[in-house]
Amino acid sequence: MTAETEAVTTGEPQVTERKHRKRLSEGARAERRLGWMLCAPAVVVMIAVAAFPIFYAIWLSLQRYDLRFPNEAKFIGFSNYGAVLSSPYWWHALWVTLIITVVSVAVEFVLGMLLAILMFRTLFVRGTLRTIVLIPYGIVTVAAAYGWQYAWTPNTGYLSALFNNSAPLTKTGTALAVIILAEIWKTTAFMALLLMAGLSLVPEDLQKAARVDGATAWQRFIRITLPLMKPAILVALLFRTLDAFRVFDNIYILTAGGNGTYSVSILGYDNLFRALNLGIGSAISILIFICVAIIAFIFIRLFGAAAPGTEG
């Protein structure tokens, strides 16, 4: 009797626990269904807006379609992709794009983190400081690019005058440096804003406890602040990297892609709107889309485990 009673009494909590888990599971499923229902309208609109251009671009990339000879359009399969990938122009454009992306995003991350910490820690004139920092980001990119172009114009530009009327936009290396500088000046504030939001996720109690334990400011930053900021870092780096990889306006205004400064977006634009070759231009666009998808996948794999709502 004792054994049976023991079995019964030890079995009841297990049954109750299983029922409780089942109820939680049903509640979680209901919450998930509600989430999908709330997201569905936006997803439908996004698919309607984005799906047709994407599939139409894929279809064009499989055609020999030159607007100068529209009657000669025909299906040629993946020949356009072969032509693009075997062209030195594509690989040069990809190399230039990667240089601009890696350098600008790396510098923006460091400067953005410093600005984020400064804005987050500043108690006085915090609103004024944030407004000043965000001014460059609020300026239209084309207008800012024309400002940079004027500043580096020999005999008239103030920055050119500081360097003995130099003309950096006429040489590949210095032109890329000016383009990267324009990118950094424009979008560091965006990076700082996202990282500052991440700083608010770090509990002050942890910082105080680490300070009491004798941890230095650098140790607290490396072992507490950065790990807890990973979700914000993912968003900041992902958004900014994808934006930098598609760089177009600064290059178009400053150099128009001349002197070997053309990016993959400039190359696609030239083929689509100047050469009127929709087949090659669409193939370049799809390759850019694939590169962007690969970059997004890499970032999510590297930082995704730290994002809210993910496990392990």
Name what the model sees in each region.
Residues 64-67, 71, 170, 247-276, ...:
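Glycine-rich helix-loop "coupling/hinge" segments at transmembrane-helix boundaries
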Residues 155, 188-194, 232-257:
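Non-cytoplasmic
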Residues 194-198, 220-233, 237:
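Short hydrophobic alpha-helical segments within the ABC transporter permease transmembrane module
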Residues 213-214, 227:
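Glycine/proline-centered hinge or cleavage motifs at structural transition points of membrane proteins
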Residues 1-62, 68-79, 88-89, 95-102, ...:
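N-terminal signal-anchor/first transmembrane alpha helix
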Residues 47, 146, 172-211, 237:
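Membrane-cytosol interface at the C-terminal ends of specific transmembrane alpha-helices
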